[in-house]
């Protein structure tokens, strides 16, 4: 029985770790912590849109769209258990990050961003949750590629 639900432990463990880390870094940022270097600055920006401030014209309505999308993904994953079992850590990271950004939208009116990468070019300001979402998508893609290769090898 315990082995059957191991993926739930991994999902919620990743969810809580990413959520807590993102909120902790955001709390340091909101408390005024700043740092500058040649490549990366820790600063403060409030993003009222999504990536690269897209959809910021939706203003406060964006948080309800964000809530609906996260809700649909939660329902879909718990309905499609095989997908959740296969990618439990990645989806835990993704949803922990998404819920952390959603909390920001309700509390601060936008998402708290702090990392500004600026060596040779000015990249968008981002946060820990954004990094975790990108890592989780990369994990899912890598797992799917290796799963397909393993399946193809068995057919040979």
From Swiss-Prot:
Membrane association type: Multi-pass membrane protein
UniProt xrefs under InterPro entries: Peptidase_A8 (IPR001872)
Top-level taxon of the source organism: Bacteria
Keyword Nucleotide-binding among UniProt keywords: no
Keyword Hydrolase assigned: yes
PROSITE patterns: SPASE_II
Catalytic activity annotation: Release of signal peptides from bacterial membrane prolipoproteins. Hydrolyzes -Xaa-Yaa-Zaa-|-(S,diacylglyceryl)Cys-, in which Xaa is hydrophobic (preferably Leu), and Yaa (Ala or Ser) and Zaa (Gly or Ala) have small, neutral side chains
Keyword annotations of the record: Aspartyl protease, Cell inner membrane, Cell membrane, Hydrolase, Membrane, Protease, Transmembrane, Transmembrane helix
GO BP terms: proteolysis
Subcellular locations according to the entry: Cell inner membrane
Active-site residues, Swiss-Prot/TrEMBL: 113, 130
Transmembrane intervals: 5-25, 64-84, 89-109, 122-142
PANTHER family for this protein: LIPOPROTEIN SIGNAL PEPTIDASE
Family indicated by similarity: Belongs to the peptidase A8 family.
Function noted in UniProt: This protein specifically catalyzes the removal of signal peptides from prolipoproteins.
Protein's recorded name: Lipoprotein signal peptidase
Organism: Campylobacter jejuni subsp. jejuni serotype O:2 (strain ATCC 700819 / NCTC 11168)
């Amino acid at each position: 029985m315990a082995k059957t639900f191991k993926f739930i432990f991994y999902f919620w463990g990743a969810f809580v770790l990413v959520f807590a880390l993102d909120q902790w870094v955001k709390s340091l940022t909101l408390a005024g912590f700043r740092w500058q270097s040649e490549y990366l600055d820790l600063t403060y920006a409030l993003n009222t849109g999504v990536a690269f401030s897209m959809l910021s014209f939706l203003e406060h309505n964006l948080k309800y769209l964000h809530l609906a999308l996260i809700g649909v993904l939660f329902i879909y994953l718990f309905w499609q258990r095989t997908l959740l079992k296969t990618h439990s850590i990645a989806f835990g990271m993704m949803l922990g990050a998404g819920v952390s950004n959603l909390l920001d939208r309700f509390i601060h009116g936008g998402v708290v961003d702090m990392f500004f990468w600026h060596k040779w070019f000015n990249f968008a300001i981002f946060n820990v949750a954004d990094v975790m979402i990108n890592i989780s998508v990369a994990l899912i893609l890598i797992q799917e590629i290796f799963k397909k290769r393993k399946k193809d090898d068995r057919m040979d």
